[in-house]
Amino acid sequence: MPTAPLYYLPQGFSVHIVANTGLRVVDNFCTAEEAEYLINKAREHLTRSKVILNNKAVDDSGRTSSHSVAFHRHHQDSHVLPIIARGAMLAGVPMDHAEQIYVSRYSDGEFYHGHYDFSDSFMSDHRLCTILIYLNDLDENQGGETYFRELNVAVRPKAGRAVIWTNMNPDGSKHLETAHAALPPRGEGTEKWVIQLWFRPYQMHPIREKLASLQVAEGIPLKGDEELPPGTWIPSKTAA
């Protein structure tokens, strides 16, 4: 079970349930400083995002974003550790069950078509849980939502907001309703930045770095009610 203490949660951290969907939306999952750090760090090393096909990472016309590795076996950035710790606590698994972690950028018009986060490939099988964290804000005119077609839910990007869902049960049965798409941001110069955490039921990478210190920075403030486009629903009040 996770051993990371609760003080690694930003102040204002709150979990909301999207009724009858299995989705959780977490506001203030990361701080403004963490989001800015991840964007600036990733921008230096972006490459074309790929998909897994026949156990190989390949280019695909259905995924047009770019990404950068934020944390892996040979490069363990201590600034990313508190984010992994929070994710592990919510997923109910140890930190070292996280896969290699990416920051992704979607520029104007870029997208990722509908897909699952699990497959029969060894490179993406046994993904128990996904935590998708937005690193910047987009308004209703800028698009960029994460759209769950089967659930008829679209979540708008908001800096510090995370969406959490379970991909598979311990017995290996899959949650087919978790098919989702990254809708394109709209507008010249518009970008969407996210960081993805995928957790498995077994160790992926031993964590060599240590959590540095107590986290005292406040999370990104909540901003009251939101005006959402038709068909979009994001919880803003009912906490669980």
PLM regions: where:
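Fe(II)/2-oxoglutarate oxygenase catalytic core
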Residues: 1-164, 168-240
